[in-house]
Amino acid sequence: MKISIYGAGNQRLYLEQLKVPEKFGGEPPYGGAGMAIEFAKAGHDVVLSEPNRDVMSDDLWKKVEDAGVKVVSDDIEAAKHGEIHVLFTPFGRITLNIANTIIEHVPENAIICNTCTIPTPVLYRSLEGILRLKRRDVGISSMHPTGVPGTPSQKYYTIAGKALEGKEYATEDQINKLVELVKSVGKIPYVTPADVVPAVADMGALVTAVALVGVLDYYRVGTQIINAPKDMIEKQILISLQTIASIIETSGMEGLMKVFNKDALLSSAKNMLIDERQEDLNLALKIIEEFDKSTIGEKDISQTYLVAPQALIKEAVSLIGKSAVEGMIRRSSNKLFK
């Protein structure tokens, strides 16, 4: 296959700050450059677009080129090459700008894939105009490595499939092509709903894993020990998660620190220590007790509405119609990445 990768990856971050070789193994270069080497060694025709040669040393660039990867500095040149386009680029607006630059130049039926930089639905919405009018053939998905490319622990690629609300951003053939590519390099393809990818495959998986442990613990305690109704337990889980998410959205972590009283939270949570299996809660209590809020800071929270989003959407659809609501969702979700 012809593969185009955009962004070699910040090698200084991997080597000096994250200490990837010591912690996860493998050899540099990592990131997009590591991905390019992996695909090239599997026999694919790979172009790596990176306008900034300073992201890594000359010896690492030589490793990339010796693997058979063609290195270019022009995104449009890379766009004309690939059947599959992988954006290993900085979080947010830069990735959207690159996608908008390349989409008119990619071959017919090409696939543009995000990695950990932006959710697939947001990438699609930023390109929706041209996808509807000129490039209906182009698919949007993800080739999200679950780990740092170039390390032994990176065993999966998460591929964005049909969204939870039913939207398909790529054809079945395009998704199958990504699956085939992943298998060709000895990795495991994991096709998951497009909306779920960031929660299970991005760095935020740390939050997902820790939160899920708390959810599972409370569900077990609530349904099996307290014998509370399942519906009540699920609603209380929703309230906790929605409260935290809503405050962070409007006011950041500083707002969350302002509104949460550590002592009150500890007192309440300690009352939920019911059996010896709750190691997760014991650890959480210890971490919260030792945590110094001044390391983040505080600020007054902005006006925040604590609502159930799915219920709100149903109510809005009944009042103004599905098309209008989908437009509102599109515009509001895009604002997160401006």
From Swiss-Prot:
GO molecular function, one term: oxidoreductase activity
Keywords, alphabetical: Oxidoreductase
InterPro entries linked: 6-PGluconate_DH-like_C_sf, HMD_C, HMD_C_sf, HMD_N, HMDII/III, METHMP_Hmd, NAD(P)-bd_dom_sf
Presence of the UniProt keyword Oxidoreductase in the record: yes
Matches recorded under Pfam families: HMD, HMD_N
Oxidoreductase among keywords: yes
Gene3D superfamilies hit by this protein: Hmd, C-terminal helical subdomain, NAD(P)-binding Rossmann-like Domain
Family of this protein: Belongs to the HMD family.
Annotated protein name in UniProt: H(2)-forming methylenetetrahydromethanopterin dehydrogenase-related protein MJ0715
